Every structure is written in structure tokens, then in C-alpha cells.
Amino acid sequence: MLCLCLYVPVHISERTEFEYFESESLPVQLKSLFKLSLFLPSQEFDSYRKWRKKVVKAGDKDLDGQLDFEEFVHYLRDHEKKLRLVFKSLDKKNDGHIDSQEIMQSLRDLGVHISEEQAEKILKSMDKNGTMTIDWNEWRDYHLLHPAENIPEIILYWKHSTIFDVGESMLVPDEFTAEEKNTGMWWRHLVAGGGAGAVSRTCTAPLDRLKVLMQVHATRSNSMGIAGGFTQMIREGGLRSLWRGNGINVLKIAPESAIKFMAYEQIKRLIGSNQETLGILERLVSGSLAGAIAQSSIYPMEVLKTRLALGRTGQYSGIADCAKHIFKKEGMTAFYKGYIPNMLGIIPYAGIDLAVYETLKNSWLQRFATDSADPGVFVLLACGTMSSTCGQLASYPLALVRTRMQAQASQEGSPQMTMSGLFRHIVRTEGAIGLYRGLAPNFMKVIPAVSISYVVYENLKITLGVQSR
């Protein structure tokens, strides 16, 4: 019969001591754990408390807020199985040992780049016999009761496109761990992200409509400022007009997210990657192709959004009426005006956003990720805001040309220009600055959009039963 395992915390000024008492009938593979006397410096006590909270949450089967001996043993066995899977994924040579090169390669596959010196430092923290390699026993003994996070949890903490919605649809999809896919948590993340996007876009819709108006109507001779633009919209259609075109902008979130995710997973299989996570280049290629497929599928909704945003009060009775007017007057091809610059804008936006975000993520992980891969709210928001801003800045001229091409037929007397012709016309008549009309309201909405989508996403995760970070 198994007796109860006790640990007694003793607070001392310089260290905190934990005594583990061994049970005679404890399973062999767990005995060594209870022969330990751990001496933790006082500054590491917070790490211990975080680890204890995490263990109780993972192993508490009867949900009584406590971990009895049977639950603790079950947790250790289950955790050891997970550690075995992670060890095998790191052991690229299948020789039963992990060296510094394998650690560097595994993190590189995830998008985390470290030097050989840093990899050796990681090895030394686990290497007991000085061989500069880690076998299974060393790996298990170090991680079984250690508060550090494993590699898949970096994916969990650093989700990007799922969490942040700034109104653009060109981000590379997030990676999901095998556990998230097997348990069905992936679709809950997508639903939470979609709901967050709907709230975020609705809250920032006035700025988005102002951006469209400035992209199409603002010129060197017809300057339109932010205050003037808002005044003009309210005078023409009242406060309600500030949200004109927002309905279709929200409706397109669900089909676009679903198509992009399914396409991304299929493209990953087609390029022959069996890894749980892709490298940066593979992610960019797969994500850009998935984005192109999703955008092609819902592009008519993009045209409708632009036309509704530019429409006068009473011009259209709704989305269906707008679509009917466009089809009757201009034909089916009108629903794909501006398609080429839209597709061309995916690569610079997605590429720069991903590169900046991964660079910031790697920098934080290398400098500050000592006990946890969790960056906290402020770091996540800062990284998401900076990467989205850089991506938008790079692709903005293409976005402006796309919007003007979508709007051409709705402007009486406006010549129907090609993409290259419109570029030349803007530069000749307005200068290079003309390619950045509407940039100010576009940037103004980034911080509130990122903040709102994050808060709503976290709350929807709780509602949907997604494991909290």
C-alpha cells in the first residue's frame, strides 16, 4: 500500500528547503524523485509556486484544488510520456543522445535562433557527466520536476495572427501543437480569434472608413485631414455612417479564417513537411499561398466593403443590394478589380510582419526567457503592434492602388486604369507621398485594434474552455 508523500517547506532567510519523504512501495522510476532534498534560493521561490500551480492544475482529476498522492503519481507518469516525445523530436540522429547542434536545429525549425555558445549553455545545465550530450535519463531527471517550459509551449504563448486583428488579412497563420490539434483546441482558438476580430474591427471601423475615403478622394489639391474627414462623414450621414461597410468586413472573417487554415495545413503536407512546426521560409511560403487562396475565395467581399464604405447615404439598402447594382452595371469582373495588387501585397506584408515578429520574439526569448516562455501581455502587444506596423508600411502603396481600382467604376468620369497606369498617374500628379494617403488613420487604429482583439480573445478563450496560458 502506498503511503502519502509529504513535502515540508521551511522558510530560511537565504534559502527555502523542501524535504521529500520516500514511500517504500513507490514505483522504481519515481523513487529517485522522492530521495531529493531541493534547496531553492529565495528568489526562485516564485518559480516554484508557478510550477506547483501548473502541476496541480494538470493533475487535479477530481477538481478539488489539491493534488493527492495518486494524482501526483499519475501526473508524473503522464508528464514523462510527454517528455519522451519531446526528447525523440530533439534527437535528430536517433542515437539516444542530444547534442548542441540538435538543440540549435530544433529551435531553428521553430523559428528561434540561438548561437552554439547558448546551445552549449543549455546542455551544461542538464549534463551530469560532462560529456556535452544529454541522454534520456538526464533529460527526464532535469525536466520532470523543473519549472522550465518545453518547446511546444513557445508556440502556445507566442500565437500571433490568431490573437491580433488589425483589419488586414495577410498574416501567416499560426502554428498549432499536435496536442491542440488532437484535442480540438485549434478550432476554439480560431473561433476566439474570429470573435476578437469582429469586436476589434467594429470598434475601429470609423478609422477604417476614413482611411478608405482618404485613399480614394484625398489628393494634392483636395487635402483631407482626419478631423475634416470625420466631420464630412457625420455631416453626410450622421454618426451611423461611420460604420458603413463594417458589416461585410466582419462577415468575411469566418470564411477567410477557415479557408486559410485548411489551405495552410494542406500546403504543409504538399511540401512534404512532417514536422510539428515549420521553419521561417516554409511558413512564409505556405502562409502566403494559403493567404492567396483565402483572399481569392472572398475577394468579392473586399470589393463590396470598399463600395459600401464609399457609398452615399441611401445609395445602397444593404450588402445584397450593393452586389446586385455592381453586377448589373459592371458585370462579374467588377468583383475582382484590384485583385492583382492585392495578391502582390501579400508577400511584403506577410514576410515583413513575420520577420519582425520572429526577430522580436527571438530577442526576448534569448534575453529574458529564464523560467518561462510566457512573454506577458505588454511584450506580446508591443511585438504584435510593431510587426503589423512594419508590414503595413511596406505593402501600403499596393493596398492604396487596390482600393482605387476597386472604387474606379463608382466614380463618375474616372478613367479605368491598370495597376501600373494608376501607379504612374499617382506618382506623376501627387508625388510619392500620394501612395501613402490615409496612412495616418491606418496607423492610428493599430494599437487599439491589437489591444481590443487581445482582451476579447483571452475572454473568449475562457468561455470556450481553452486552456489558459
UniProtKB/Swiss-Prot annotation:
It is found in: Mitochondrion inner membrane. The keyword Transport applies. It comes from Danio rerio. GO terms for molecular function: ATP transmembrane transporter activity; calcium ion binding. InterPro entries: EF-hand-dom_pair (IPR011992), EF_hand_dom (IPR002048), GDC-like (IPR002167), Mit_carrier (IPR002067), Mitochondrial_sb/sol_carrier (IPR018108), Mt_carrier_dom_sf (IPR023395). The keyword Repeat applies. Keywords: Calcium, Membrane, Metal-binding, Mitochondrion, Mitochondrion inner membrane, Repeat, Transmembrane, Transmembrane helix, Transport. Ca(2+) binds at D60, D62, D64, Q66, E71. It comes from the Eukaryota. One of its GO terms (biological process) is ATP transport. Belongs to the mitochondrial carrier (TC 2.A.29) family. The gene is slc25a25b. The chain crosses the membrane at residues 190-207, 245-264, 288-301, 338-357, 381-398, 438-457. It is a multi-pass membrane protein. Residues 208-244, 302-337, 399-437 are mitochondrial matrix. Solcar repeats lie at residues 184-270, 278-363, 375-463. This is Calcium-binding mitochondrial carrier protein SCaMC-2-B. GO terms for cellular component: mitochondrial inner membrane. Residues 1-189, 265-287, 358-380, 458-469 are mitochondrial intermembrane.
